[in-house]
């Protein structure tokens, strides 16, 4: 479809359309890592105002960035089976309304962070928002097959944001959590890119399977998964976590490697999408294990 429906008509949007613009499932996973960052940062407990309004501010800014992504990608979304029913692609929300909504979310999020956390958290969150909405969505996504590697730093920021919200300063520990998500991002997205290779090619998006082929991508997924396993052990190495986390990191990472190997071998028809799905469970469970282990250590 050469001309988007969203450029011809704008049926009245309902609240669910605006909620969809925020990519709520992605935001929830980001908030989990932000919460872990907060709780790991202090032994004394996180003030409820920081816990509630700090995470709400981060969520609003993330939702604003996601809404900008919908606007910029509306033509691409209309061409892909996974995204063609999104609000802008189907014309349920206009680009102007979506941008106004994104700006409102970002301003509200920044106001909450400045009021209830600290300026450093607000600045870092703003940098993450711009990194995703402008640098990744506006440029990198269409410019290079390494788009999600370079742009992955913005999406890896939530545990750092949570840590800084609770403490007011940066340190090595939250940067290690950022590194874990940074290493996780390529195998997570490239597995999906293999599954949706034809759609990305149709939309002219230079994802790695489109530009370099599936075998090359599978090799890199395997290599990044090995790197992720190694990086995920560093919290134990630097005594940030204990044995419980170590066991969980090894078990979860081993399973991720198993899926990456199955994908590489090409022995199962749905290995790519199953690897993608497992990667989501992996990140969620890894950070939960880190949090549980932290409180076990505090009570010893």
Swiss-Prot record:
It comes from Pseudomonas fluorescens (strain ATCC BAA-477 / NRRL B-23932 / Pf-5). It is a multi-pass membrane protein. InterPro entries: Protohaem_IX_farnesylTrfase, UbiA_prenyltransferase, UbiA_prenylTrfase_CS, UbiA_sf. The gene is cyoE1. Keywords: Cell inner membrane, Cell membrane, Heme biosynthesis, Membrane, Transferase, Transmembrane, Transmembrane helix. This is Protoheme IX farnesyltransferase 1. One of its GO terms (biological process) is heme O biosynthetic process. Its main location: membrane. Carbon 2 of the heme B porphyrin ring is defined according to the Fischer nomenclature. The chain crosses the membrane at residues 26-46, 48-68, 97-117, 120-140, 148-168, 174-194, 226-246, 280-300.
